[in-house]
From Swiss-Prot:
GO cellular component: cytosol; nucleus
Protein's recorded name: Uba3-binding protein but1
Domain of life the protein comes from: Eukaryota
Gene3D superfamilies linked to this entry: Glutaredoxin
This protein's encoding gene: but1
Cellular localization per UniProt: Nucleus
GO molecular function, one term: thioredoxin peroxidase activity
GO biological process terms on file: cellular detoxification of hydrogen peroxide; hydrogen peroxide catabolic process; meiotic cell cycle
General function of this protein: Acts as a negative regulator of the NEDD8 pathway. Has a role in meiosis.
UniProt keyword Nucleus, yes or no: yes
Keywords from the UniProt entry: Meiosis, Nucleus, Ubl conjugation pathway
Length: 243
């Protein structure tokens, strides 16, 4: 089959020529530009189809950008029932909403905290870790709060029997109605979801969860300390409080 070359020729009027003649259309650009997939896919399309294709590409780009945006929900809401906080000196206060006064918070969630804590070996890993670098957290303008589903009486009992080396001002919230733990998804799935998971949760100044560090029997203390320090330091830099 012989191809008619005249089908690929277009009439072009030149400024210098006196007579118009048929010549092959050739476009030579002196500007180099990067070829894109979108240009290759839209080349040769009908204008209506090309417009629809571009609109679809723009819509897909917007969807991708929206998917990349991370939406953080506040951790604490107005509580339907007041909760009680055992402060660092053993006093009991009633609150309806956890105030966010510092740049960030380190929340220590406890399961069942009842037990004999007269010896350091029996103390939960949360308290051992936090007590070692509590001054460092304060230097980053970070406060520490414990949250447990235990009663106020049990909290006062185990705090009173802490070893002297681990005694520091750690306020502990008695979330006996499980409202805070349920809101943050920190209830243990076993046992009817009545006990809090053992974990350290770091939130920023507006109540957004930035890191969750679960506590297990095999958790390395040094690794846990490093993880908490790095996250808190990042929040301090983010808030402009540390260079």
């Amino acid at each position: 089959m012989e191809i008619d070359q005249n089908l690929f020729q277009f009439p072009i009027s030149t400024r210098d020529a006196v007579h118009e003649k048929n010549c092959t259309l050739r476009v030579k650009s002196t500007k180099k530009r990067r070829s894109s997939t979108k240009d290759e896919e839209t080349r040769g399309m009908h204008p209506h189809i090309k417009s629809s294709f571009r609109n679809g590409m723009n819509h897909a780009r917007v969807i991708r950008e929206e998917d990349m945006e991370v939406v953080f929900e506040p951790c604490f809401i107005n509580l339907s029932k007041p909760v009680y906080v055992v402060n660092g000196i053993g006093g009991i206060n009633e609150i309806h909403k956890l105030p966010i006064l510092f740049s960030s918070f380190v929340l220590c969630f406890f399961g069942n905290v009842s037990g004999d804590y007269g010896y350091v070996d029996n103390v939960p890993l949360h308290i051992s870790v936090i007590s070692h670098f509590y001054p460092c957290l304060q230097s980053y303008n970070t406060d520490v709060i414990g949250i447990t589903t235990d009663t106020v009486e049990n909290i006062c009992q185990w705090k009173a029997h802490l070893p002297r080396a681990l005694q520091f001002s750690l306020p502990v919230i008695s979330d006996s109605n499980n409202e805070i733990c349920r809101e943050m998804g920190m209830l243990h799935p076993l046992g009817g979801a009545k006990l809090a998971l053992d974990a350290i949760v770091i939130i920023d100044s507006i109540g957004r969860r930035r890191d969750i560090l679960p506590i297990r029997t095999t958790t390395c203390v040094s690794t846990l300390i490093t993880a908490v320090q790095e996250t808190v330091r990042f929040l301090a830099i983010e808030n402009g409080r540390l260079l």
